[in-house]
Amino acid sequence: MTNLLEDLSFRGLIQQMTDEEGLNKQLNEEKIRLYSGFDPTADSLHIGHLLPILTLRRFQLAGHHPIALVGGATGLIGDPSGKKAERTLNTADIVSEWSQKIKNQLSRFLDFEAAENPAVIANNFDWIGKMNVIDFLRDVGKNFGINYMLAKDTVSSRIESGISYTEFSYMILQSYDFLNLYRDKNCKLQIGGSDQWGNITAGLELIRKSEEEGAKAFGLTIPLVTKADGTKFGKTEGGAIWLDKEKTSPYEFYQFWINTDDRDVVKYLKYFTFLSKEEIEAYAEKTETAPEKREAQKRLAEEVTSLVHGREALEQAINISQALFSGNIKELSAQDVKVGFKDVPSMEVDSTQELSLVDVLVQSKLSPSKRQAREDIQNGAVYINGERQTEINYTLSGEDRIENQFTVLRRGKKKYFLVTYK
Protein backbone atom coordinates (compact mmCIF):
# COMPACT_ATOMS: atom_id res chain seq x y z
CA MET A 1 0.00 0.00 0.00
CA THR A 2 1.23 3.47 -0.83
CA ASN A 3 2.46 5.37 2.20
CA LEU A 4 -0.39 7.64 3.31
CA LEU A 5 1.74 10.78 3.72
CA GLU A 6 3.33 10.14 0.32
CA ASP A 7 -0.13 9.96 -1.25
CA LEU A 8 -1.25 13.14 0.52
CA SER A 9 1.95 14.83 -0.66
CA PHE A 10 1.37 13.73 -4.29
CA ARG A 11 -2.12 15.21 -4.08
CA GLY A 12 -0.78 18.50 -2.71
CA LEU A 13 -2.82 18.01 0.46
CA ILE A 14 -0.09 18.85 2.97
CA GLN A 15 0.42 22.53 3.66
CA GLN A 16 2.21 22.22 7.00
CA MET A 17 2.75 19.52 9.59
CA THR A 18 4.47 19.15 12.91
CA ASP A 19 7.22 16.55 13.28
CA GLU A 20 6.88 14.85 9.89
CA GLU A 21 9.25 12.04 10.85
CA GLY A 22 7.41 11.38 14.11
CA LEU A 23 3.98 11.43 12.46
CA ASN A 24 5.09 9.12 9.65
CA LYS A 25 6.50 6.68 12.23
CA GLN A 26 3.28 6.85 14.27
CA LEU A 27 1.10 6.19 11.20
CA ASN A 28 3.21 3.21 10.19
CA GLU A 29 3.33 1.70 13.68
CA GLU A 30 -0.34 1.96 14.65
CA LYS A 31 -3.77 2.94 13.45
CA ILE A 32 -4.29 6.29 15.14
CA ARG A 33 -7.30 8.43 15.96
CA LEU A 34 -7.45 11.81 14.29
CA TYR A 35 -10.01 14.58 14.05
CA SER A 36 -11.13 17.63 12.16
CA GLY A 37 -13.68 20.17 13.36
CA PHE A 38 -16.73 21.58 11.58
CA ASP A 39 -18.50 24.55 13.13
CA PRO A 40 -22.23 24.91 12.35
CA THR A 41 -22.14 28.43 10.87
CA ALA A 42 -24.96 27.54 8.42
CA ASP A 43 -27.55 24.81 7.99
CA SER A 44 -25.34 22.97 5.51
CA LEU A 45 -21.70 22.30 4.77
CA HIS A 46 -20.37 23.68 1.46
CA ILE A 47 -17.67 22.54 -0.94
CA GLY A 48 -15.06 24.45 1.03
CA HIS A 49 -15.53 21.75 3.70
CA LEU A 50 -14.95 18.88 1.27
CA LEU A 51 -11.17 18.88 1.52
CA PRO A 52 -10.93 18.19 5.29
CA ILE A 53 -13.85 15.73 5.08
CA LEU A 54 -12.24 13.77 2.24
CA THR A 55 -8.87 13.87 4.01
CA LEU A 56 -10.52 12.19 7.01
CA ARG A 57 -11.90 9.61 4.57
CA ARG A 58 -8.43 8.99 3.12
CA PHE A 59 -7.14 8.28 6.62
CA GLN A 60 -10.07 5.92 7.26
CA LEU A 61 -9.43 4.04 4.01
CA ALA A 62 -5.83 3.60 5.21
CA GLY A 63 -7.15 1.93 8.39
CA HIS A 64 -7.09 4.87 10.81
CA HIS A 65 -9.94 6.07 13.05
CA PRO A 66 -11.45 9.45 12.06
CA ILE A 67 -13.41 11.65 14.43
CA ALA A 68 -15.64 14.32 12.90
CA LEU A 69 -16.07 17.01 15.53
CA VAL A 70 -19.17 19.18 15.24
CA GLY A 71 -18.64 22.52 16.97
CA GLY A 72 -21.86 22.78 18.92
CA ALA A 73 -20.04 25.00 21.45
CA THR A 74 -17.43 26.76 19.30
CA GLY A 75 -20.18 27.49 16.77
CA LEU A 76 -21.76 29.68 19.44
CA ILE A 77 -18.52 31.69 19.74
CA GLY A 78 -17.26 32.19 16.18
CA ASP A 79 -13.85 31.45 14.71
CA PRO A 80 -11.94 34.63 13.74
CA SER A 81 -9.71 32.69 11.30
CA GLY A 82 -9.82 34.25 7.85
CA LYS A 83 -12.48 36.77 8.90
CA LYS A 84 -12.01 40.53 8.64
CA ALA A 85 -14.86 41.38 10.99
CA GLU A 86 -16.75 39.97 13.94
CA ARG A 87 -19.23 37.20 13.16
CA THR A 88 -22.92 37.56 13.97
CA LEU A 89 -23.69 35.23 16.86
CA ASN A 90 -26.47 32.69 16.33
CA THR A 91 -28.86 31.45 19.02
CA ALA A 92 -28.26 28.16 20.83
CA ASP A 93 -31.37 26.62 19.23
CA ILE A 94 -30.21 27.47 15.72
CA VAL A 95 -26.68 26.18 16.34
CA SER A 96 -28.10 22.97 17.81
CA GLU A 97 -30.35 22.45 14.78
CA TRP A 98 -27.52 23.15 12.35
CA SER A 99 -25.22 20.80 14.29
CA GLN A 100 -27.65 17.93 13.71
CA LYS A 101 -27.89 18.69 9.98
CA ILE A 102 -24.11 18.78 9.64
CA LYS A 103 -23.82 15.51 11.55
CA ASN A 104 -26.21 13.93 9.02
CA GLN A 105 -24.20 15.29 6.09
CA LEU A 106 -20.91 13.98 7.43
CA SER A 107 -22.35 10.46 7.54
CA ARG A 108 -22.35 10.40 3.71
CA PHE A 109 -18.59 10.57 3.55
CA LEU A 110 -17.32 8.58 6.52
CA ASP A 111 -18.12 4.96 7.33
CA PHE A 112 -19.67 4.81 10.80
CA GLU A 113 -20.42 1.08 10.45
CA ALA A 114 -16.92 -0.15 9.54
CA ALA A 115 -16.04 -3.33 11.41
CA GLU A 116 -12.41 -2.46 12.14
CA ASN A 117 -12.23 1.33 12.23
CA PRO A 118 -15.66 2.99 12.35
CA ALA A 119 -15.72 6.77 12.19
CA VAL A 120 -17.03 8.64 15.22
CA ILE A 121 -19.02 11.87 15.46
CA ALA A 122 -18.46 14.06 18.50
CA ASN A 123 -19.88 17.41 19.57
CA ASN A 124 -17.72 19.74 21.65
CA PHE A 125 -20.80 21.08 23.44
CA ASP A 126 -20.70 17.79 25.38
CA TRP A 127 -17.58 18.92 27.29
CA ILE A 128 -17.32 22.69 26.81
CA GLY A 129 -20.99 23.13 27.72
CA LYS A 130 -20.34 21.54 31.13
CA MET A 131 -17.46 23.85 32.09
CA ASN A 132 -18.00 26.84 34.34
CA VAL A 133 -16.02 30.05 33.95
CA ILE A 134 -13.81 29.44 37.01
CA ASP A 135 -12.74 25.97 35.81
CA PHE A 136 -12.15 27.27 32.31
CA LEU A 137 -9.89 30.12 33.48
CA ARG A 138 -7.99 28.04 36.06
CA ASP A 139 -7.55 24.77 34.17
CA VAL A 140 -7.28 25.94 30.58
CA GLY A 141 -6.82 29.72 30.35
CA LYS A 142 -3.78 29.78 32.65
CA ASN A 143 -1.80 27.83 30.02
CA PHE A 144 -2.04 30.62 27.44
CA GLY A 145 0.13 33.73 27.48
CA ILE A 146 -1.35 36.85 25.92
CA ASN A 147 1.80 37.51 23.88
CA TYR A 148 1.69 33.92 22.57
CA MET A 149 -1.92 34.37 21.43
CA LEU A 150 -1.31 37.81 19.90
CA ALA A 151 1.47 36.34 17.76
CA LYS A 152 -0.94 33.91 16.06
CA ASP A 153 -2.12 35.00 12.59
CA THR A 154 -5.77 34.37 13.44
CA VAL A 155 -5.54 37.06 16.13
CA SER A 156 -2.83 39.42 14.83
CA SER A 157 -4.67 39.90 11.52
CA ARG A 158 -7.65 41.26 13.45
CA ILE A 159 -5.87 43.63 15.86
CA GLU A 160 -6.33 46.62 13.55
CA SER A 161 -10.01 46.07 12.79
CA GLY A 162 -10.80 44.90 16.31
CA ILE A 163 -11.57 41.55 17.90
CA SER A 164 -13.85 40.78 20.84
CA TYR A 165 -12.74 38.72 23.82
CA THR A 166 -15.32 36.15 22.65
CA GLU A 167 -13.54 35.50 19.36
CA PHE A 168 -10.13 36.02 20.99
CA SER A 169 -10.92 33.04 23.24
CA TYR A 170 -11.83 30.77 20.31
CA MET A 171 -8.24 29.52 20.07
CA ILE A 172 -8.36 28.37 23.69
CA LEU A 173 -11.61 26.48 23.17
CA GLN A 174 -10.30 24.71 20.06
CA SER A 175 -7.12 23.84 21.94
CA TYR A 176 -9.22 22.37 24.74
CA ASP A 177 -11.06 20.24 22.17
CA PHE A 178 -7.75 18.68 21.14
CA LEU A 179 -6.74 18.10 24.77
CA ASN A 180 -10.10 16.54 25.60
CA LEU A 181 -10.05 14.22 22.58
CA TYR A 182 -6.43 13.31 23.35
CA ARG A 183 -7.35 12.34 26.90
CA ASP A 184 -10.73 10.76 26.24
CA LYS A 185 -10.17 9.04 22.89
CA ASN A 186 -6.37 8.91 22.56
CA CYS A 187 -6.69 11.20 19.52
CA LYS A 188 -3.19 12.08 18.34
CA LEU A 189 -3.68 14.14 15.19
CA GLN A 190 -5.71 17.20 14.27
CA ILE A 191 -6.15 18.20 10.64
CA GLY A 192 -7.61 21.44 9.32
CA GLY A 193 -7.32 24.16 6.71
CA SER A 194 -4.12 26.18 6.56
CA ASP A 195 -5.89 29.04 8.34
CA GLN A 196 -6.16 26.72 11.37
CA TRP A 197 -2.40 26.30 11.87
CA GLY A 198 -2.26 28.72 14.81
CA ASN A 199 -5.19 27.04 16.57
CA ILE A 200 -3.79 23.55 15.95
CA THR A 201 -0.32 24.37 17.27
CA ALA A 202 -1.91 26.07 20.29
CA GLY A 203 -3.69 22.78 21.00
CA LEU A 204 -0.42 20.88 20.78
CA GLU A 205 1.12 23.35 23.23
CA LEU A 206 -1.78 22.83 25.65
CA ILE A 207 -1.32 19.04 25.45
CA ARG A 208 2.42 19.45 26.08
CA LYS A 209 1.79 21.59 29.17
CA SER A 210 -1.09 19.55 30.55
CA GLU A 211 0.04 15.95 30.01
CA GLU A 212 2.96 13.88 31.17
CA GLU A 213 6.31 14.30 29.49
CA GLY A 214 6.51 12.36 26.23
CA ALA A 215 2.89 12.92 25.20
CA LYS A 216 2.73 12.55 21.42
CA ALA A 217 0.33 14.59 19.33
CA PHE A 218 0.59 16.06 15.85
CA GLY A 219 -0.94 18.68 13.59
CA LEU A 220 -1.40 18.73 9.83
CA THR A 221 -2.95 21.44 7.68
CA ILE A 222 -4.30 21.15 4.17
CA PRO A 223 -4.21 24.02 1.67
CA LEU A 224 -7.04 26.44 1.15
CA VAL A 225 -8.39 25.74 -2.34
CA THR A 226 -7.59 28.43 -4.90
CA LYS A 227 -8.58 29.09 -8.52
CA ALA A 228 -6.21 30.02 -11.31
CA ASP A 229 -8.34 33.01 -12.32
CA GLY A 230 -8.08 34.51 -8.84
CA THR A 231 -11.79 34.27 -7.98
CA LYS A 232 -12.90 32.60 -4.77
CA PHE A 233 -13.30 28.82 -4.90
CA GLY A 234 -16.78 27.54 -4.14
CA LYS A 235 -18.56 30.76 -5.04
CA THR A 236 -20.64 31.47 -8.15
CA GLU A 237 -22.86 34.35 -9.18
CA GLY A 238 -25.66 32.47 -7.46
CA GLY A 239 -23.74 32.21 -4.18
CA ALA A 240 -22.03 29.34 -2.36
CA ILE A 241 -22.05 25.75 -3.65
CA TRP A 242 -23.67 23.75 -0.84
CA LEU A 243 -23.60 20.02 -0.14
CA ASP A 244 -27.34 20.09 0.62
CA LYS A 245 -29.24 19.29 -2.60
CA GLU A 246 -32.09 21.57 -1.52
CA LYS A 247 -29.70 24.55 -1.47
CA THR A 248 -27.63 23.59 -4.52
CA SER A 249 -29.22 21.05 -6.87
CA PRO A 250 -27.11 18.10 -8.07
CA TYR A 251 -27.32 19.58 -11.59
CA GLU A 252 -25.90 22.94 -10.43
CA PHE A 253 -23.30 21.05 -8.40
CA TYR A 254 -22.30 18.98 -11.45
CA GLN A 255 -22.11 22.10 -13.62
CA PHE A 256 -19.79 23.78 -11.12
CA TRP A 257 -17.21 21.02 -11.58
CA ILE A 258 -17.75 20.70 -15.35
CA ASN A 259 -16.83 24.37 -15.70
CA THR A 260 -13.46 23.92 -13.97
CA ASP A 261 -10.62 25.80 -15.64
CA ASP A 262 -8.06 23.65 -17.50
CA ARG A 263 -5.41 25.16 -15.22
CA ASP A 264 -7.18 23.82 -12.11
CA VAL A 265 -8.68 20.50 -13.17
CA VAL A 266 -5.70 18.23 -12.47
CA LYS A 267 -5.22 19.80 -9.04
CA TYR A 268 -8.91 19.24 -8.25
CA LEU A 269 -8.73 15.61 -9.41
CA LYS A 270 -5.96 15.15 -6.84
CA TYR A 271 -7.84 17.02 -4.12
CA PHE A 272 -11.41 15.81 -4.51
CA THR A 273 -11.32 12.31 -6.04
CA PHE A 274 -9.93 8.93 -5.07
CA LEU A 275 -8.53 8.21 -8.53
CA SER A 276 -5.07 6.66 -8.57
CA LYS A 277 -1.91 8.55 -9.38
CA GLU A 278 -1.76 6.78 -12.76
CA GLU A 279 -5.34 7.74 -13.66
CA ILE A 280 -4.79 11.36 -12.69
CA GLU A 281 -1.58 11.56 -14.70
CA ALA A 282 -3.44 10.13 -17.72
CA TYR A 283 -6.08 12.87 -17.41
CA ALA A 284 -3.31 15.46 -17.06
CA GLU A 285 -1.91 14.30 -20.39
CA LYS A 286 -5.38 14.41 -22.03
CA THR A 287 -5.88 17.96 -20.78
CA GLU A 288 -2.50 18.91 -22.22
CA THR A 289 -3.02 17.30 -25.63
CA ALA A 290 -6.79 17.63 -26.18
CA PRO A 291 -8.20 20.25 -23.78
CA GLU A 292 -11.25 20.83 -26.00
CA LYS A 293 -12.60 17.35 -25.11
CA ARG A 294 -12.69 18.34 -21.41
CA GLU A 295 -12.37 14.69 -20.39
CA ALA A 296 -10.76 15.56 -17.06
CA GLN A 297 -13.59 17.97 -16.21
CA LYS A 298 -16.21 15.34 -17.03
CA ARG A 299 -14.53 12.75 -14.83
CA LEU A 300 -14.07 15.27 -12.01
CA ALA A 301 -17.75 16.26 -12.14
CA GLU A 302 -18.86 12.62 -12.22
CA GLU A 303 -16.66 11.56 -9.31
CA VAL A 304 -17.51 14.43 -6.96
CA THR A 305 -21.24 14.57 -7.80
CA SER A 306 -21.58 10.82 -7.28
CA LEU A 307 -19.67 11.04 -4.01
CA VAL A 308 -21.82 13.87 -2.62
CA HIS A 309 -25.24 13.11 -4.13
CA GLY A 310 -25.15 9.48 -5.35
CA ARG A 311 -25.29 7.78 -8.76
CA GLU A 312 -28.98 8.50 -9.43
CA ALA A 313 -28.55 12.25 -8.93
CA LEU A 314 -25.42 12.15 -11.11
CA GLU A 315 -27.33 10.47 -13.94
CA GLN A 316 -30.06 13.12 -13.71
CA ALA A 317 -27.45 15.89 -13.86
CA ILE A 318 -25.82 14.30 -16.92
CA ASN A 319 -29.21 13.88 -18.65
CA ILE A 320 -30.09 17.53 -18.10
CA SER A 321 -26.66 18.68 -19.28
CA GLN A 322 -26.80 16.57 -22.44
CA ALA A 323 -30.36 17.68 -23.25
CA LEU A 324 -29.44 21.34 -22.87
CA PHE A 325 -26.33 20.88 -24.99
CA SER A 326 -28.12 18.98 -27.78
CA GLY A 327 -31.35 20.96 -27.51
CA ASN A 328 -33.36 17.73 -27.15
CA ILE A 329 -35.50 19.10 -24.30
CA LYS A 330 -38.54 16.91 -24.96
CA GLU A 331 -36.66 13.85 -23.71
CA LEU A 332 -36.43 15.34 -20.20
CA SER A 333 -38.83 14.52 -17.39
CA ALA A 334 -40.82 17.28 -15.68
CA GLN A 335 -38.54 16.94 -12.65
CA ASP A 336 -35.47 17.36 -14.86
CA VAL A 337 -36.98 20.51 -16.38
CA LYS A 338 -37.79 21.87 -12.93
CA VAL A 339 -34.18 21.40 -11.85
CA GLY A 340 -32.44 22.39 -15.08
CA PHE A 341 -34.49 25.55 -15.64
CA LYS A 342 -34.79 26.66 -12.03
CA ASP A 343 -33.23 30.06 -12.73
CA VAL A 344 -34.85 30.66 -16.12
CA PRO A 345 -37.58 33.37 -16.39
CA SER A 346 -41.04 31.80 -16.31
CA MET A 347 -44.75 32.47 -16.20
CA GLU A 348 -47.66 30.39 -14.98
CA VAL A 349 -50.73 29.99 -17.18
CA ASP A 350 -54.06 28.20 -16.93
CA SER A 351 -53.78 24.76 -18.52
CA THR A 352 -57.06 25.32 -20.39
CA GLN A 353 -55.90 28.59 -21.94
CA GLU A 354 -55.01 28.67 -25.65
CA LEU A 355 -51.70 30.39 -26.27
CA SER A 356 -50.47 31.64 -29.61
CA LEU A 357 -46.72 31.31 -30.01
CA VAL A 358 -46.43 34.97 -31.06
CA ASP A 359 -48.23 36.15 -27.90
CA VAL A 360 -46.07 34.00 -25.64
CA LEU A 361 -42.86 35.29 -27.24
CA VAL A 362 -43.95 38.86 -26.54
CA GLN A 363 -45.24 38.18 -23.01
CA SER A 364 -42.01 36.37 -22.15
CA LYS A 365 -39.95 39.25 -23.60
CA LEU A 366 -38.09 36.76 -25.79
CA SER A 367 -39.24 39.01 -28.63
CA PRO A 368 -39.84 42.76 -28.09
CA SER A 369 -42.92 42.97 -30.36
CA LYS A 370 -45.38 40.84 -32.33
CA ARG A 371 -43.70 41.90 -35.54
CA GLN A 372 -40.31 40.82 -34.24
CA ALA A 373 -41.83 37.58 -32.93
CA ARG A 374 -43.16 36.72 -36.40
CA GLU A 375 -39.76 37.49 -37.94
CA ASP A 376 -38.02 35.34 -35.32
CA ILE A 377 -40.35 32.43 -36.11
CA GLN A 378 -39.92 32.85 -39.88
CA ASN A 379 -36.14 33.02 -39.52
CA GLY A 380 -36.06 29.72 -37.60
CA ALA A 381 -34.86 31.29 -34.36
CA VAL A 382 -37.69 29.94 -32.17
CA TYR A 383 -37.70 26.50 -30.55
CA ILE A 384 -40.34 24.64 -28.53
CA ASN A 385 -38.83 21.99 -26.26
CA GLY A 386 -35.74 22.04 -28.46
CA GLU A 387 -37.56 21.68 -31.79
CA ARG A 388 -37.60 24.54 -34.30
CA GLN A 389 -41.05 25.99 -35.03
CA THR A 390 -41.49 28.08 -38.21
CA GLU A 391 -45.29 28.37 -38.37
CA ILE A 392 -46.26 32.00 -37.64
CA ASN A 393 -49.82 31.19 -36.52
CA TYR A 394 -48.78 28.27 -34.32
CA THR A 395 -50.76 27.74 -31.10
CA LEU A 396 -49.24 25.83 -28.18
CA SER A 397 -51.05 22.54 -27.59
CA GLY A 398 -51.00 19.69 -25.11
CA GLU A 399 -48.36 17.95 -27.23
CA ASP A 400 -45.97 20.80 -26.41
CA ARG A 401 -46.19 20.12 -22.68
CA ILE A 402 -43.68 17.98 -20.83
CA GLU A 403 -45.77 15.73 -18.57
CA ASN A 404 -48.51 18.38 -18.85
CA GLN A 405 -46.46 20.69 -16.61
CA PHE A 406 -43.92 22.64 -18.67
CA THR A 407 -43.12 24.04 -22.10
CA VAL A 408 -39.57 25.26 -22.73
CA LEU A 409 -39.20 28.07 -25.26
CA ARG A 410 -35.93 29.22 -26.73
CA ARG A 411 -35.04 32.12 -28.99
CA GLY A 412 -31.65 31.99 -30.60
CA LYS A 413 -28.97 29.96 -28.90
CA LYS A 414 -29.27 30.95 -25.26
CA LYS A 415 -32.47 32.86 -24.43
CA TYR A 416 -34.80 30.47 -22.59
CA PHE A 417 -38.26 30.87 -21.10
CA LEU A 418 -40.35 28.40 -19.13
CA VAL A 419 -44.14 28.16 -19.36
CA THR A 420 -45.68 26.31 -16.41
CA TYR A 421 -49.28 25.10 -16.33
CA LYS A 422 -51.62 25.18 -13.36
UniProtKB/Swiss-Prot annotation:
Gene Ontology BP term (one): tRNA aminoacylation
SMART domains in UniProt? S4
Locate the residues binding L-tyrosine: Y35, Y170, Q174
* Enzyme class, first EC level, given as a word: ligase
As annotated in the record, motif 'HIGH' region runs over: 40-49
Q: Subunit structure, per the record?
A: Homodimer.
- How is this protein named in the record? Tyrosine--tRNA ligase 1
Please state the gene responsible for encoding this protein: tyrS1
